[in-house]
Amino acid sequence: AAQPNVSKALKNLEEEYGIRIFERSSTGMIPTEQGRHFIEQAERVLREVDRLDADARRRQGECAELRVALPHATYASYAAVDFLQQAAGSEQLQVHIREAGSMEGLDFVLRRGYHLALLRYAEEDEDYYSRYCARRGLHREQIMEFEYRLLVNRDSPLARHEVHDLAELNRYTEVLHDDFQLPGEEGSSLRWQVNENRRVHVYERCSQFSILQSLPTAYMWASPRPQRALEQYHLVLKKFPAQNQRMRDVLVYPDKGGLRPEEEKFIELLRRQAALTVK
């Protein structure tokens, strides 16, 4: 079946370029003078295509490229910085780091060409995200499981004793991000409802540590933090015994049969930083 297709393709070429590539006889086909010239040019073109392809692959190998969507997680930010430090010697560097919620992170991976997204969600939402990712061909890797803690100044009265009742927090000032919502519906009986008259709403995340560092009467609900971040800002994480809401950080990426070296390296660094957090 292949021979007739080849003959037809040759005839189409001859008609398209107005040349005769082969002389046909009962014993076979012999290239004409025009045909030999055409074949030599075609071989040169193919060699050039191979060269361009190899050059493109070489340049791609020299470019450290990574696009990752992350929640507001200090350990993930540290992993991103570690990745940049290791990739700094690359001839080319193309890295996109975007802060995103879980659904937004999924959108960046599925529709916007991002390589990885770290999702953060409550344990009871596991089935939803598992089915969502399975239907869309996304691989999942759990990075961390944790409970929210109280993040306070080391000199705060809250740092010196265990808090057993939310009412104990009413005389302190809560620092919270305007876009941050702890698990549980508005008005639910979960432990997050504290004195609404003593709150600082933060719209610029970098100021949160400065506020806690300078205001011993302030606190915020926080996920695990690297020890060096706590030491740098003179902070401590305190367990709240009545708080048993389990959270998960899960990394997702397209299940395409393998990871690029940059993706493997970032995941390695992310797991390393997760292991160093104070939970």
Regions found by a protein language model. Give the residues of each.
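N-terminal winged-helix
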Residues: 4, 61-103, 107
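A short LG(V/I)-centered, amphipathic sequence patch enriched
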Residues: 14-31
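Alpha-helical linker/hinge and terminal dimerization helices associated
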Residues: 16, 38-60, 66, 75
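Secondary-structure junction motif
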Residues: 77-82, 126, 165-194
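Hydrophobic hinge/microswitch elements
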Residues: 110-115, 179-237
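Flexible hinge/capping segments at coil-to-helix
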Residues: 132-148, 152-174
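Short beta-strand->loop
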Residues: 134-145, 222-224, 231-247, 255
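A late-sequence structural motif
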Residues: 236-279
